[in-house]
UniProtKB/Swiss-Prot annotation:
Subcellular location: Cytoplasm, Nucleoid
Family membership: Belongs to the RdgC family.
Cited Pfam families: RdgC
GO molecular function list: double-stranded DNA binding
Top-level division of the source organism's lineage: Bacteria
Annotated organism of origin: Xanthomonas oryzae pv. oryzae (strain KACC10331 / KXO85)
UniProt key word Transport: no
Role, per record: May be involved in recombination.
GO biological process: DNA recombination; regulation of DNA recombination
Main subcellular location: cytoplasm
Gene Ontology CC: bacterial nucleoid; cytoplasm
Protein name in UniProt: Recombination-associated protein RdgC
Keywords associated with the record: Cytoplasm, DNA recombination
Amino acid sequence: MFFRNLTLFRFPTTLDFSQIDTLLPPVQLKPVGPLEMSSRGFISPFGRDEQGVLSHRLEDFLWLTVGGEDKILPGAVVNDLLERKVAEIEEKEGRRPSGKARKRLKDDLIHELLPRAFVKSSRTDAILDLQHGYIAVNSSSRKSGENVMSEIRGALGSFPALPLNAEVAPRAILTGWIAGEPLPEGLSLGEECEMKDPIEGGAVVKCQHQELRGDEIDKHLEAGKQVTKLALVLDDNLSFVLGDDLVIRKLKFLDGALDQLEHSEDDGARAELDARFTLMSAEIRRLFLLLETALKLSKAE
């Protein structure tokens, strides 16, 4: 259940989530209809075993999951059938259908194919820290994150969540760290980075499995390149890649964090899940608070 990517948003800590269990059932995921392309709504964080449980809260952490059902209708299939229809009409009437007629034919084909199309299911998990006013979405896609915000907004009626905003340029901070400026306590460099020439269309350099403080990196910095992605390690607990878009990718929970699970005395699947949720939430909070200070992240109040 550990998140692998984090797209973060801020929201006011004054928001009231006390009625969330009442508000979610009306916006629960409904099966995609025969003539619908997709459906979105909340599902149980625990999967099919507890379908009626649409949220999970432990202290100040709230776990929500947005589910989706999407019809798979390959464009190549539609276009192939459309060309056959067009060819039949051309042979029968001696002329090719107009653009408007082709569009109508295509719409009719989609309408005909939708009820027979395969359905792909998906889920996107999110953790809300109600004390510090941020939401961490398990996705590296800003669009996926915004979709989750939209679903929460639909449930609450209002949800003024905003993407993270740094009061200092993230590139400048990341470049400074790789150039030798002191990192926040507990943070160290990993072995991966991406550097770009600031001019439009400039060179891009990607380094992996490499010592990031050395002559080769220094030459790129001297040439004016700026760091846009940087691998970092938080103590022995987390490793991740931080981008200048403030998205956290390749998040991995290390032994320093996972060892805490071995000391848990609770038994049972739910107890184990709660232990993992508690651990993950606490580590993400620690990371967020560190980045909040280092990057001067704006609040949403």
